[in-house]
């Protein structure tokens, strides 16, 4: 068994991907080679890929797409790419054309989960509770049918990139302008208060397995990029201090959403808990594997160590 790990990418989450790759390489129980996609879209292989990992950045690559890789050498590809052109079905489609098994969700599920607007539409139709939201496209009038505060987010980014909390209607356009720097579509979501943020991991293909529920606590106005990836900025409680009924509800909703959206392999499912009601926020089909990332820590708390988690993900790619 030999694995190809692909990291980096052209999205704003480039550095997060490299941090995740460092952890995966350290704990992967199978022989693994690394390929890094630089910010310019070209690829780095071999020692140059490892050097980029060490530097935590790859501004320029060497090989244009498709890279000269010995694809027949690899049994499984692990696309550890966060955000657009990695988590949205793009790379998954390339791997489908190659006929290579890969870790994680397929093309359709990846694209659907990446789009915060479309995934909410599907989940709401299936009876999964979601926070009130409206989609706004670049160049169109912004009609928000609920009062602030609310969050403005690019529809297709992760790691809280491009997100603003808006307290007054007069600040909406500036928040949309920021979101439109990253996407042609934004979502405006009603801000819940007071609110607790919960996360649960799912592992499996048709029938997933839910991890214990965790809770994220922080002092920042919201769970932004710096809070997520700076050690000490957030406190992760595993298991979350919840009554058994709420914990069961969160796990059941995570598994239902996973199945409804057709996800395979893995996902981290994020929830809000407000006034006793649980709302699904989003599914991340390629969750972080950094030292502060919740997904591996959730499963470790459930008795699945990091190397065993990776082994199961690779084996799921082959089934």
From Swiss-Prot:
Binding site for ATP: 147-198
Metabolic or biological pathway: Cell wall biogenesis; peptidoglycan biosynthesis
Membrane spanning stretches: none
Positions with a binding annotation for Mg(2+) 2: 282, 284
Catalytic activity: 2 D-alanine + ATP = D-alanyl-D-alanine + ADP + phosphate + H(+)
GO terms classed as biological process: cell wall organization; peptidoglycan biosynthetic process; regulation of cell shape
EC nos: 6.3.2.4
PROSITE patterns: ATP_GRASP (PS50975), DALA_DALA_LIGASE_1 (PS00843), DALA_DALA_LIGASE_2 (PS00844)
CC cofactor note: Binds 2 magnesium or manganese ions per subunit.
UniProt key word Plastid: no
Location of the ATP-grasp domain: 120-315
The keyword Amino-acid biosynthesis belongs to this UniProt entry's keyword annotation: no
Pfam families noted in UniProt: Dala_Dala_lig_C, Dala_Dala_lig_N
Function: Cell wall formation.
Family in the record: Belongs to the D-alanine--D-alanine ligase family.
UniProt cross-references to HAMAP family, sorted A to Z: Dala_Dala_lig (MF_00047)
Name assigned to this protein: D-alanine--D-alanine ligase
Lineage, broadest ranks: Bacteria, Thermotogati, Deinococcota, Deinococci, Thermales
Gene: ddl
